[in-house]
Every structure is written in C-alpha cells, then in structure tokens.
Amino acid sequence: MPRYFFNARIADELISDPEGEVLRNPDRAWEMARAMIRELLKTEGVDERLLNATIEVTDDEGGIVLEFPFAEALLDAEDESRTKH
C-alpha cells in the first residue's frame, strides 16, 4: 500500500510530515486530511490564518496527490450537522 504525507501549508510556511501514513488509496488520504483539519480547528480554534491554510497530501516521490483547504473541511462539517430528511 502507498504511503501518504500530510504537509500543512500555512501562509508561506510548509510544515512537512516526515513519517506519513500507509493508506489503501487517495480516497482514504482525503478522509484522513479532512479529519486532521477538523481536529486541529477544534483544538486550536478557527482563525483567519488557519482558514486560509491547506493540507498538501503527497506520495513517496513528493508528488501532490491532493490539496485540502481548511475552510472546505469546516464548510463540510456544517453541511453534515444539518438534519437531513
């Protein structure tokens, strides 16, 4: 299974994930990125710097697999909290 690295880009700073996670596919990496962002926003609070940040998920070779904006994870959480009939 491939290894994915979850690097945080906050303004001009890139915080690299040196270890990564072995996951079955990019869909699972997307789910993990969303969960990481939500947890960070829950513990750190929502501020403008974080709302403009992204998680860059890369593969073993450093290629970007996906970019997940923090704001998108927050909006996604609001949609899930609504009652659906």
Which ranges hold each PLM region?
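A short, structured loop/turn motif at beta-sheet edges
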Residues: 1, 24-28, 59-62
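A short, charged, amphipathic alpha-helix used as a generic interaction element across diverse proteins
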Residues: 26-41, 45
